């Protein structure tokens, strides 16, 4: 994974084998003009990578929420209000975090498409804890043939 720092961000610099001619950026850090996405310590349970649109005001966000008994993950883009939410679904924690459901949600205010050249299995058949192959359809076939 490589995330190139943007102009104005503070970075942590180390040196390969202690050689000052071989600097390497090993991380980024926050400062007064580059604050964490959500207020601390109020939202200490959120691990977030949030970008800002170049010459714009929108953002993309990867958020991992480790709230006890309500863990979740989300990948979101302000463009089209598009998002993939996984786990315990809530409204954003900084806005109160009211429950919305459990499982997953893939949503957009724009168009969406699902493509699979070799086929697509869409089922409501239970397969707890991913206990079989992702294309396992034995039970589905049994139900259809019954």
Features from the language model and the residues they span:
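Structural signature for extended repeat/solenoid scaffolds and their inter-repeat hinge/linker regions
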Residues: 1-146
């Amino acid at each position: 994974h490589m995330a190139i720092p943007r102009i104005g961000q503070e970075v942590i610099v180390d040196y390969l084998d202690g050689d000052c001619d071989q600097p390497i950026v090993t991380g980024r850090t926050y400062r007064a003009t580059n604050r964490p996405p959500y207020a601390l310590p109020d939202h200490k349970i959120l691990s977030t990578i949030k970008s800002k649109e170049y010459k714009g005001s929108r953002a993309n966000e990867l958020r991992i929420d480790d709230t006890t008994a309500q863990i979740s993950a989300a990948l979101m883009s302000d463009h089209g209000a598009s998002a993939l939410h996984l786990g315990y679904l809530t409204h954003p924690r900084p806005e109160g975090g009211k429950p919305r459901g459990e499982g997953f949600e893939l949503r957009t205010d724009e168009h969406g498409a699902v493509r699979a050249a070799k086929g697509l299995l869409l089922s409501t058949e239970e397969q707890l804890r991913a206990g079989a192959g992702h294309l396992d359809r034995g039970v589905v076939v049994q139900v259809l043939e019954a």
